[in-house]
Each structure stands twice: as C-alpha cells, then as structure tokens.
Amino acid sequence: MSELQKSFAKAKLAKLPPEAPPFSMHPPRDEDDSESASSTGTVVPSPSRQLFARSRGSTCGVIFRLLAILTHPRSNSVETLNWTDFFTQELFLIQETDSARITHHVYLTPPTNSGPLFVMHHGAGSSGLSFATCAEEIRKILPKAGILSIDARDHGQTSTYTETGEGKVELDLSLETLNRDLVFIVRETQSKMGWESLPDIVLVGHSLGGAVITDVAKKGELGPKVLAYAVLDVVEGSAMDALQSMEKYLSTRPTRFPSLASGIEWHTRSRTIRNRTSARVSVPSLLYEEAAPTDPSKPWVWRTNLAETKPFWENWFIGLSKKFLEARGGKLLLLAGTDRLDKELMIGQMQGKYQLQVFPEAGHFVQEDQPVKTAQVLVDFYKRNDRSALVLPPKVADMQASAAMKQGAEAGAVPPFGRGQGSSHKP
C-alpha cells in the first residue's frame, strides 16, 4: 500500500464513531430458564456458543444484535398482552335469577370440522385468561379444537347485580352455584353460537375450577357429550391441608400496585407465575384501577377479594377425590408434584382408574408455567377418549359365521346354517 493510500485510510478511520461496547445478542431470559424454554418450545443457544458472532468493530454486527433483541419473542417485557392474541371472540351471557342479574363473561374460539370443545374453569382469584397461552398451544396442535374459557362469578369481567341493578348481591361462590353457572354458560354459548347440538366436550379445571368441573361431570348435567375431564393441581387432601395456611399467605401478598406492569413483575418475581408471557396476558385481568384510590401512588387493587371467599373453601373440596374417581368419562389428574396425592387417589392410581401426569418443574399454575406441555397432554387425553375415532371390532359370532361361509364357498359346500330346497338331509 502506498503512503498516499495509508494516509487516506487513516483519515477515514479517524472520522468513524467510537467502537460500540460489545453485548450479547441474546435477550434476557425469564426468571427460570427451564420453565421458560419449555413453555415456548424455544431453545436459545448460550452466548458462549456465539453462533451469530460478528467482529467487535463491525457496525453491521451491532445493528444485527440490536434487531435480534428488539424482535426476539422471549424479551423480558412486562407490557400487557391482549386477549385477542389468544381467542377469536368474547361473549357476555346474561342470566336472570330470582334475586340477581349475572353477566357471565367468556373467551371463545369456536371448534371447526366437528372438533372438540375444551371448557376451561380457572381457580379462585384468577380468570379465564389463566388458560390463554395453553389455549393457543392446543390450537397449534389440534387446529379444529374449540376453547371456551370462562370468568367465574365475581372474577374477571363477570358481574353480579341485584334485579334493580342498584347494587351487588351477597357473595355466593358455593360449589352448587358455580356448578349451575358453568352448565348455564355452556348451554347459553350453544344457543348464542347457533349450534344444533353440543360438540364433544373435555372439561378442564384448575384448583377451584377442578372441583367445579368434577362436580359437573359427576352430576352429568351436560349429558353424554362430556367425553372426559381433567383436573389441574388440586386434590382433596392437600387442598384441605393448604386451607389452614391460606390466610397467612394472603396476608403476605401486596394489596396494591402502582401499575399493571408492577403487578406482572410481582407475579413473576415471586414465582407465582413462572412464565412471563402468560403473566403478561393473565395478570391484568386480576387487577383494576380504583377511581378514587386510598393510596394514589398505588391505584391498582385485586379484582377478587380472596379473603371474603373463606366461608366457601371447605365446601369446594370436601368429597372431591371420591367424585373424581366415580364420575363417568375419561379422567386426567395433572399435578406439579406427586406429594399432592391423597390416599384415595393413590389407591385409584394403582388400580388404573385415571391418568396421572406430573410436571415437577411447574408451580401451582401448571397451565401457565408449562402451556406447551399442558396443551400436548390435554390433546393426547382428548384423542384417547375420542369416540368418533373409535372403530369397534366385529362381534365374535359374526366373525365365525363369515369364516364358515368362506370355507364352505371354497369347498363348494352348502353353508352349515342353511340348505337349498332340493337338498337331501338324513338325520
């Protein structure tokens, strides 16, 4: 290189901006790498592998890394996600009773091509969006499936008022009431959607929701269309034991949040929900902003006051194990740990009365922590109980008759169970 060329190159290099500090293209992961990766089915190579490395002085490399962070689906954002990303529509179903007017709110993606309908019931203090990410994954595996995820009474956007509309009615979250609500919602959805008959149904309930769907399955009020039911992380024995410490747990929870983002952050940092994507869609439905907050710096409060539900706690879970084992239809119990099994269910498991699946890496909200795995288990569970795919073998008598006819035809003989009119017969 000539001296003239060298001096020209030095002059150009001197005008370039300072070298950008190096940083990894890999975005921050959720708080628990194992849960986060399995929740999305996405495996991100470790930074040490440097699969997309660029030279430190390369401006293109810096831009590439920036774009990767901005567009990567596993970003550490606490921005809320809308329900429309997971369901196709919402319904408001009005139920009139002697003392109240209830507006049930549900999220719906209708089934297609004779697909099944997964009816989802959340746990206490949660909402229908607790199943949002799981519903999305179910549809990826089984596109014809429908999802009906409800907001239970006094949860989410479901509201209960007196007949005059002047005030709220007394809180009633008894198992019997929640049972009637769920049956009404399914039937009213059928009417609203103009379905001539109900599609095949798989009931899915988490925690309190597990008790409700088991009660519905046991009483058979939705008829033979209920193929099966799945209970997520609740059994009678451990639930009754946990009630003793419920008040202490509630006293340790924050009562207010400065913003929705801080509410999402608390759920993920406390590991109440271990999947940030699910928290971003489900947590906003658990909170509402007070018009005149007592603490203006923290205007967001819980939509459902769990402490007020205490009178119903035992009513939800007493007799759950017995009903779960006795109800008609396929049975699935999905737990976050085998230590949750009580004696009755352990015996039932050894007798092969139900399917047991355990996700030890998940917390209590298994469908939120592990939506991909939960969806796969639920779809496989449906397929095992799908009557439309069942081909019954021919009866033994029919098989014997068919074999005899074939043998007689090959030998030119008359079938053993009938002779022609002109045939002779000796006793």
From Swiss-Prot:
Pfam families from the UniProt entry: Abhydrolase_6 (PF12697)
Catalytic reactions of this protein: [phosphatase 2A protein]-C-terminal L-leucine methyl ester + H2O = [phosphatase 2A protein]-C-terminal L-leucine + methanol + H(+)
UniProt-listed Enzyme Commission number(s): 3.1.1.89
InterPro entries: AB_hydrolase_1, AB_hydrolase_fold, PPase_methylesterase_euk
Membrane-spanning parts: none
Class of enzymatic activity (EC top level): hydrolase
Active site: residue positions: 207, 233, 364
Function of the molecule: Demethylates proteins that have been reversibly carboxymethylated. Demethylates the phosphatase PP2A catalytic subunit.
Protein family according to the UniProt entry: Belongs to the AB hydrolase superfamily.
Record-given protein name: Protein phosphatase methylesterase 1
